[in-house]
């Protein structure tokens, strides 16, 4: 009798163990392209657009939001493998979100391309309101030594690089990938506004007065919203000091995001796309403070048109990669 009871108990335990065997985990989403924006003004659709809205309206209207622990905003993915999220403004904020998303087992980034997108400023000698720029280099503006101009010889530099930052103070993006992005940008419709056209005429630079176009160059990443001709000149000198291309865009996140991605997957599939919504200095006769805090009616205009231009230009390379995925899966094909 005792033997029978023991056998029945063992069978019951075995049956219970079998019932508790976990079902196979859902396969992770294979990400082909991840689009990162830094902020949205209100909702993802139907109101004034920030950086994320043009992407959302193109790719994720029918997609459910997925919460990722540690990320600022949900991640959206469509059936084609195009995913994206709003990461937050500034290096730390955006990097924390990007790291959380990359480490989430629900997503497979092993063959993903990254489009880091947003708005920024441009020096009037290099760009204009409404321009869209693909980065050839990402440079960190903050890393190094600085001191007050009053403590220096007049006109001498007030920045000195510091040894030890060489591997993460600048990143050269893959020239072939950038070349494809530029090629597929040709012919993209570029919007403009009457307000932006009038505002450009305050500047003497031919480039500042030009119509919006697609350009390439160095994107300068700084948590400090640096402004004025002196700091613009310093940014240009840092780009030259590091062997990068001309500084054309100032922004707050891309170099930091590149480091986060590099430590997981390298930098060979990163694109940085920025639209210019302001100049990095005032017009002739305008102080830097006046330009930073303009009187009513004295703003640049063109914000809505610029974010539309970012989406129009960036979506071309995203769509091309997805449509020709067998060719792009293993890396950018030869130009």
Which residues are covered by each model-predicted region?
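Bacterial N-terminal signal peptides
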Residues: 5-14
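Bacterial Sec-dependent signal peptides at the C-terminal "C-region" and cleavage site
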Residues: 13-21
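Accessory terminal and edge-of-domain segments that mediate assembly/interaction
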Residues: 20-335
């Amino acid at each position: 009798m005792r033997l029978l009871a023991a056998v029945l108990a063992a069978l019951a335990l075995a049956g219970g163990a079998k019932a508790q065997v976990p079902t196979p985990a859902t396969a992770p989403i294979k990400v082909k392209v991840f689009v990162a924006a830094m902020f949205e003004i209100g909702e993802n659709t139907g109101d004034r657009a920030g950086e994320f809205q043009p992407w959302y309206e193109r790719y994720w209207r029918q997609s459910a939001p997925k919460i990722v622990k540690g990320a600022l905003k949900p991640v959206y993915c469509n059936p084609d493998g195009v995913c994206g999220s709003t990461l937050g403004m500034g290096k730390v904020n955006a990097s924390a979100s990007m790291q959380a998303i990359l480490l989430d087992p629900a997503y497979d980034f092993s063959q993903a391309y990254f489009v880091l997108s947003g708005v920024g400023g441009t020096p009037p000698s290099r760009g204009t309101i409404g321009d869209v720029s693909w980065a050839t280099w990402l440079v960190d503006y903050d890393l190094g030594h600085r001191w007050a101009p009053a403590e220096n010889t007049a006109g001498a530099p007030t920045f000195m690089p510091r040894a030890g930052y060489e591997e993460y103070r600048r990143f050269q993006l893959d020239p072939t990938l950038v070349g494809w992005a530029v090629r597929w940008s040709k012919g993209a419709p570029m919007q403009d506004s009457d307000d932006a056209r009038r505002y450009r005429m305050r500047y003497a630079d031919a480039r500042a007065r030009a119509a919006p176009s697609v350009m390439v160059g160095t994107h300068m990443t700084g948590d400090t919203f640096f402004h004025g001709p002196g700091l613009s000149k310093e940014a240009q000198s840092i780009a030259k000091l590091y062997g990068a291309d001309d500084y054309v865009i100032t922004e707050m996140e891309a170099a930091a995001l590149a480091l986060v991605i590099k430590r997981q997957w390298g930098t060979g599939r990163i694109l940085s796309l920025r639209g210019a919504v302001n100049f990095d200095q005032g017009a002739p006769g305008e102080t830097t403070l006046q330009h930073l805090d303009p009187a009513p009616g004295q703003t640049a205009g063109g914000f809505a048109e610029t974010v539309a231009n970012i989406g129009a230009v960036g979506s071309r390379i995203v769509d091309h990669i997805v449509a020709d995925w067998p060719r792009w899966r293993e890396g950018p094909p030869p130009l």
